[in-house]
Amino acid sequence: MRENMARGPCNAPRWASLMVLVAIGTAVTAAVNPGVVVRISQKGLDYASQQGTAALQKELKRIKIPDYSDSFKIKHLGKGHYSFYSMDIREFQLPSSQISMVPNVGLKFSISNANIKISGKWKAQKRFLKMSGNFDLSIEGMSISADLKLGSNPTSGKPTITCSSCSSHINSVHVHISKSKVGWLIQLFHKKIESALRNKMNSQVCEKVTNSVSSELQPYFQTLPVMTKIDSVAGINYGLVAPPATTAETLDVQMKGEFYSENHHNPPPFAPPVMEFPAAHDRMVYLGLSDYFFNTAGLVYQEAGVLKMTLRDDMIPKESKFRLTTKFFGTFLPEVAKKFPNMKIQIHVSASTPPHLSVQPTGLTFYPAVDVQAFAVLPNSSLASLFLIGMHTTGSMEVSAESNRLVGELKLDRLLLELKHSNIGPFPVELLQDIMNYIVPILVLPRVNEKLQKGFPLPTPARVQLYNVVLQPHQNFLLFGADVVYK
């Protein structure tokens, strides 16, 4: 039987989870480099295709087939009318599907060798003679092809998806009329009937696909977190800075990837670097976080004045020989005990410059610079400044992904001290080395790591969970590879 084709706007079902991730990747040749990039591999698209096919199958089974009526004229019998009605889809099999990339355009979602089984009723009338019965319709070798165009909303920074075209093809349609004295009469017109039902199914399928894209897939795209609030100080801008770009093997999109202040949005005084992704395809999703992304976090929190803490003696284990008291400090700085006898000491630690993180193939290196100011706590609870020192160090940062959040742990190397000011007279700053080497690991670092373990959310849409995560540091960016599951 001659192949038929229907075209119409395209629509897709609720396989949106991967498709939203599809719309967040990395095109590193833009005029403005992204701070965060996500790349979807063919493996990721294959998973999206599986999810999409399962969802589409449910949607297509809900197709309502309109009644079909026509007239007939047979020599010696004259004219009559017949109708096919109450048609229901009993089975809609979609055995093979694929999402492929169309370079510089978007995606193509295709299904081949679909089979449909439909049951319904028929009736015929010739003057006062009425006949009726049941029928079964079998559609074999149906193919569906939908072109999906990906874009971005320049105002909201969210991804968009539209269906630029949809087509369906049916290889064969067969109608079987139930036993009836006049069933043979309907069989005389089976080609006409099959052609009419073929056209109706083609148009209904593309209409259903189109409605799914606009009513389900596009709204799901809006669940992608763009402006994500972290706390009262900062949030993350995950908005797209360019429309998604496709090649023959990958789908890439650029995201701003920048921490911002909840109080004021000033652009950082540095720019994102270029990220050159390696050729990797064994994970569904690849996420690149540039050092720009991390360093905007340090800038925002330092400018907000929240990178600080106060250390007191009651925070030190009782069994420790190191104490934050003027008596203990007097053992190596006699002037402290002389001027402020038998008093507690408070130490205020604050970032003097925004902390800087460097990402290299060898790992993540952290460069904090802090001011450490010591005060004697007077009997009236007021504070008397003792000295101010600068403290520099380098550290290594270990990161991982837990529950779709990026978490970290900081380890510090040797502390380098510099005396900036003293109210107790000049002294060798090396005298403070032991006490700093003690209080930083047991008081400062645990509190920093407690914050880092809370982490911050990665740009994943609703109901998508990352697993099987691998991390690799590269020049200027950290690369995550992960598989995903839609829950």
UniProtKB/Swiss-Prot annotation:
One of its GO terms (biological process) is lipopolysaccharide-mediated signaling pathway. Keywords: Antibiotic, Antimicrobial, Disulfide bond, Glycoprotein, Immunity, Innate immunity, Membrane, Secreted, Signal. Changing residue 49 to C: No impairment of secretion and increased propensity for dimer formation. InterPro entries: Bactericidal_perm-incr_a/b_dom, BPI/LBP, BPI/LBP/Plunc, Lipid-bd_serum_glycop_C, Lipid-bd_serum_glycop_CS, Lipid-bd_serum_glycop_N. The keyword Nucleus does not apply. Residues 41-224 are annotated as: N-terminal barrel. Coiled coil: none annotated. Residues 32-42 are annotated as: Central sheet, part 1. Pfam families: LBP_BPI_CETP, LBP_BPI_CETP_C. This is Bactericidal permeability-increasing protein. Disulfide bonds join 166-206. The lineage of its organism: Eukaryota, Metazoa, Chordata, Craniata, Vertebrata. Residues 468-487 are annotated as: Central sheet, part 3. SMART domains: BPI1, BPI2. Belongs to the BPI/LBP/Plunc superfamily. BPI/LBP family.
